């Protein structure tokens, strides 16, 4: 049944609303029944979940007038659902105590209703006869479901209209819209003829970006970061890219790029850019516990827009080995990102680091200072390069108070295609680093390589079972191991490499000590299975090998570990992680190890 609005029906609706509000006619539990012969199980479920009458109790509809109001609204609701499913000739009957709801006068409605019966005669399923969208922009692809002979649905019509409009917008016609739409149901043939006429409008070019909103960022910096394409042909993708560049700075809580309603007489289209700044400062904390290495604490302090040019100043600090087997060590780092110094997808940065590392095999103090540039290719891919100096003073297996002075040129590229950074179920992550280092003050020169690749795949629906794998490769090419600072060399063991083995326990024997290798290979595999939405169990195996040469070979030293773990999901923070691991291979093992932290192991 399809109802048309009229002044009389509107007046009846007003009176009806007043009566619903004023008359406390409470009804006893309403007995309901839905009959839809020939309808699929999924369609019946949709009707049951959507009908106001069938869900009256859960909606809190108590009075007879509320039940009647729900029944009247259900006519339109059910017909629309039938149209969505391709039934364009349905007959809907809703009876309250045996009387058709549409025929009940609200002013003389009974005080209670005891029973509601909904009967839906679906009729035949319709198919498209005509399915036309005109005119179309070049290369526009309409939905496959909108074609002659295909099952007719209102959803297919709406999607076809949207695709046609979007095709013109992609071609630069920013104000393209639907001009007219003709839909004819031919009941005798169970056929639906749909014709959609589009109004492309003129092709427009980008005009000006007009900055609005409450922001303390200099407008000149906003424009440089945005790279607004004034003078270029309109493109929705370019608008989206402008917003992405601005959000990427981490300065703004809200970025809205909205086109003006009316184009300019010269064929350009201006845009309003509205901003709201995030709070200027942000503090984070982290902790990780390992049985042998004690507690590691980390903290960061970030100041956004520190010089009103959308810069981000970040301090980080760490304390390690608290209560562990080695002396407490830590680090203090600083990085200043400057997004408005180069082009819209490029930024510059300053970095500085002071670090002390105390391990079983070496102690080293490091200071570094660098300046670099970063190119962002997409939300998933970036590369950066910098130049700077590093000073290292080390005590290791090769001697005490050894000094290393370098001019370094680190390159790094990261490609992140994971579906989640904190608990991935599919995709991959690649991190490649190359760092040439030129020795100063009689220090040897060389190149350091490092690669970290991770992959994820789901076996069950909704990520119920996830297989995760990781490969790490490292190499130092050029100088011998005894002529390189120990923090450039490679060890294996502990969280991040081989769980079940003590931290950095595997290296190259040198006299009575152990030094790092010039090459490293790490392999890790995990099977993650959900027990509940929040709780997961994990089984894992890790393998590590180091070698004195620049490539891990048959003569390398190796070890491995395996174990089980529990993950408890903390939402956007990632899971709370607890792992138990034991040595499997090698002579560096020290019994059962446990690890507690936030986030997946990789």
Regions of interest found by a model, annotated:
Residues 248, 267, 281-282, 288-290, ...:
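C-terminal outer-membrane beta-barrel translocator/porin domains of Gram-negative envelope proteins
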